[in-house]
Amino acid sequence: MTATLNTVQDLEASVLAGTAITRDEALSLIDAPLDELSAAADRIRAQMCGDGFDMCSIINAKSGRCPENCTFCAQSIRYPTISVDSYPLITADELVRQAQENKDKGVIRFSIVTSGRKLRRDEVRHICEGVRRIKQEVGIEVCISAGLLSAEDFQALHDAGISRVHCNLETSRAYFPSICISHTFDDKIATLQAARDEGMSLCSGGILGLGESMEDRIDMALSARELGVNSFPVNVLVAIEGTPLAGTEQLRPEEVQRCVAIFRFILPQAAIRLAGGRELLGDDGKACFQSGANSAISGDMLTTTGTTIASDMALVKDLGYTVTLDHSHS
């Protein structure tokens, strides 16, 4: 494909034919008519992924007192004016209880999220115990988001029954030092590669509204494509008082919708997953679910309130989706 094929229709046809969109081609979509762009992204989603909708929920299994300095996060100890619940790892019984509660509501993927740079080895063993019980007693897909874990950690977690690892890139490689300097973009990449090498599927996306450019957002998605991510979460910044990003101007819903549509061109087969901040869009993400997004994190987030699982189930059904695991869930 040549760079002259830069219309929405030409790029749609190229993506559907199996050609990977280039960076310049993705950049050309920034100024495309939104309605045309969204409709094309939805057609790509329908042809490449079908009408399945992957609904997951998360549990804040260890909260607060994180030593890292991510500028958007309320759980960092670097920002002492923020009041956030802090507690150690919850019990295996509580993990099982919450997994069952979410499964009963129709959720098909349950992610265990912990604060901190990474889990200690004894904490990994504790999580493994809970996961084995969840797989035996509940029967639900289990994911983990536990920081910069090692290959040895991933082997133990995979053996226990965890199928997917989440570790957000957050933004582009170029912009990453603007939001965090206590760890690096390459630390993230190494973590995801270690999980992939262990045979686990990858969930990695980022946050819109950190002050990044559209080019940064596209570069983030291209990095995710290079990693072969199966799920690409799209968060919208909830600017929390007390963090360095407090007072940041909120993105317009149309800008988020445009980003989601462009992400679908870049990641035609991934589950593009609306995540934190969806309540800021005004329609709980409906326009984005018609612009290439085909999955969501439902319920409350880590330190912010989300949409209800029941309302999400009704919304995606009305849009013609069927709740099911994304096609690349292994």
UniProtKB/Swiss-Prot annotation:
Reactions catalysed: (4R,5S)-dethiobiotin + (sulfur carrier)-SH + 2 reduced [2Fe-2S]-[ferredoxin] + 2 S-adenosyl-L-methionine = (sulfur carrier)-H + biotin + 2 5'-deoxyadenosine + 2 L-methionine + 2 oxidized [2Fe-2S]-[ferredoxin]
Describe the function of this protein: Catalyzes the conversion of dethiobiotin (DTB) to biotin by the insertion of a sulfur atom into dethiobiotin via a radical-based mechanism.
**EC number(s) in its UniProt entry?**
2.8.1.6
Cofactors demanded by this protein: [4Fe-4S] cluster; [2Fe-2S] cluster
Return the SMART domains for the record. BATS, Elp3
Alphabetically list the UniProt keywords.
Answer: 2Fe-2S, 4Fe-4S, Biotin biosynthesis, Iron, Iron-sulfur, Metal-binding, S-adenosyl-L-methionine, Transferase
Q: What protein name does the entry list?
A: Biotin synthase 2
Name the pathway it acts in: Cofactor biosynthesis; biotin biosynthesis; biotin from 7,8-diaminononanoate: step 2/2
Annotated residues that bind [2Fe-2S] cluster are located at 111, 143, 203, 273
Q: Which terms does the record give in the GO molecular function aspect?
A: 2 iron, 2 sulfur cluster binding; 4 iron, 4 sulfur cluster binding; biotin synthase activity; iron ion binding
Q: Hey, which family's this protein in?
A: Belongs to the radical SAM superfamily. Biotin synthase family.
The record's section on PROSITE patterns has: RADICAL_SAM
A single Gene Ontology biological process assigned to it is: biotin biosynthetic process
Task: Describe how the cofactor binds.
Answer: Binds 1 [4Fe-4S] cluster. The cluster is coordinated with 3 cysteines and an exchangeable S-adenosyl-L-methionine. Binds 1 [2Fe-2S] cluster. The cluster is coordinated with 3 cysteines and 1 arginine.
Q: Which Gene3D superfamilies match?
A: Aldolase class I
Note the InterPro entries from the entry: Aldolase_TIM, BATS_dom, Biotin_synth/BioAB, Biotin_synthase, Elp3/MiaA/NifB-like_rSAM, rSAM
Q: Per UniProt, where does [4Fe-4S] cluster bind?
A: 66, 70, 73
